[in-house]
Amino acid sequence: MTRSFSCVALLILAVVTASSQTLRDSAGRSGMLVGTAVRPQQLSEPLYAATLAREFNMIEPEDVMKWETIHPAPESYDFSQGDRLVAFAISHRMKVRGHTLTWHQQNPPWLNDRQRTPEQQARILEQHIKTVVGHYRGKVFAWDVVNEAFDETTPVKLRSTIWYDQPGIGRAGKGSAYIEDCFRWAHAADPDALLFYNDVEAEAVNPKSDAVYAMVRDFRRRGVPIDGVGFQMHLGNLHPDVASISENIGRFIALGVQVQITEMDVALPVDSSGNARPADLRLQADVYREIASACLTHAGCTAIQTWGFTDKYSWIGSHSKHTQGSALLFDGEYRPKPAYDALRKVLEGSRRQ
């Protein structure tokens, strides 16, 4: 009886939601991309797949295009899960953002050979970028070429990584030269793909975004093929400085690049059952509304993407030892939250085409 009731309830929820205005409908009318990060293994769950296809016009892999999955051994590439995601996107008329070609985390153990020379490391990175981008040429419209290259120290500096200086690719001490190499290699593999630099805690005007801004300005002046900047927008603050975020978006767009919000979630305090307070859910909705409005104010802010869409699979709980959660647009039962309605209404109210 209980199982039958649950199935009926889910069916009713799907029918009601499908008959209403969706995020995808509203984004299409405003000329925006609205996306989410995806785990391909969850596509086998009918309600996950149905909600994803109905609500979003863009998807991005959470993990399956990162090194540890796609290039697990020196001479071995595994495109199977990435291909599955791309096939889903094509069948549902969705765009795909590739994530990520160069990062300091989630790399396979074989990359951590400290006996390797910078020249050898450079050849490995170049081959990887050209192989992965080439495999998805014409199917992935945009790439996060380099992710989180700047650290959080004061003053901000390039993060010490296997790509920069341990052993690096022969560009240590030469500023953002290794990042430039990555963009040139990606462009050579797919000249039509949009190439983004992506970072965390750089959404407002601050020392990190200043460092990113200086790099992008230099790249644009010298013709380095960079097309955009991604602001991750992982927020734990229910009162972000929206004016500063809007100012930051504007100054990057003035350089001639796009800005995309790439990994948004808004973490809330939760109880032992994972439930947030209604008052916090309303504040969360305000944050989604205000950030989306700040993006939509600028014609060059072209996408709003969340890091997952259902609290059922959010990374926030495990990351915070389950003291935070409820960060996304749908709850664990795929019911839209106040944040969903707030984002949809902002998209519906915009006419930028």
Where are these regions (language model features)?
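Short, acidic/polar
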Residues: P40-E55, G82, A122-V132, P207-F219, ...
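Glycoside hydrolase catalytic-domain groove-lining segments
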Residues: D83-K95, I169-N198, V205-G274, A292-T297, ...
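Hydrophobic h-region of N-terminal signal peptides that target proteins for export
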Residues: L10-S19
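Boundary/entry segment of secreted carbohydrate-active catalytic domains
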Residues: Q21-E62
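Substrate-binding cleft and catalytic face of glycoside hydrolase catalytic domains
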Residues: L23-R24, R54, M58-P72, Q81-A202, ...
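Substrate-binding cleft of secreted/luminal carbohydrate-active enzymes
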Residues: L281-H319, D331
